[in-house]
Amino acid sequence: MAEPLLVVGLGNPGENYARTRHNLGFMVADLLAARLGAKFKVHKRSGAEVVTGRLAQRSVVLAKPRCYMNESGRQVAPLAKFYSVPPADLIVIHDELDLDFGRIRLKFGGGEGGHNGLRSVAAALGTKNFQRVRIGIGRPPGRKDPATFVLENFSSPERPEVPTICEQAADATELLVEVGLEPAQNRVHAW
């Protein structure tokens, strides 16, 4: 039997951050957990919240680090080790400044694009070679600091679109689990 995939949604814990752009990874992870009909429980060794189940007929561990975004790697790496998941079988779901709002892209490896959560995961794993579900939030308007922008709630025009974007990102994640990166990219990037 194949080892599980580790699917991690990135975000910040706490109600103050729940509806911010930086928490799209958590929002999608919550949606995937609901699709599994499961509730997150704290994994004692890593401190992250986890759900185990099957997505697209594949065993998965779905996780949300309970530490702040910039420290995500310190909970993701122990989870990967505990479940014997190599970096190539890790899928990280995250917000992406370098994509237009609502655009979803799948990627393997590469840079972090200034995303400190990705940087933390890559540093803790010792490699950038893991899969990513990138959810576009767009660039901040004018001269607004990107660090401030990602920690703000979605704007009034964006807010109604967020549930649909999360559904699409969850669908993209399930497709990635089911068919692998290249076939999933071919379909998702055509949406």
UniProtKB/Swiss-Prot annotation:
The record marks 95 as: Stabilizes the basic form of H active site to accept a proton. TRNA binds at residues 17, 68, 70, 116. It catalyses: an N-acyl-L-alpha-aminoacyl-tRNA + H2O = an N-acyl-L-amino acid + a tRNA + H(+). Keywords: Cytoplasm, Hydrolase, RNA-binding, tRNA-binding. The record marks 12 as: Discriminates between blocked and unblocked aminoacyl-tRNA. NCBIfam families: pth (TIGR00447). Belongs to the PTH family. Monomer. PANTHER family: PEPTIDYL-TRNA HYDROLASE (PTHR17224:SF1). This is Peptidyl-tRNA hydrolase. It comes from Mycobacterium ulcerans (strain Agy99). The gene is pth.
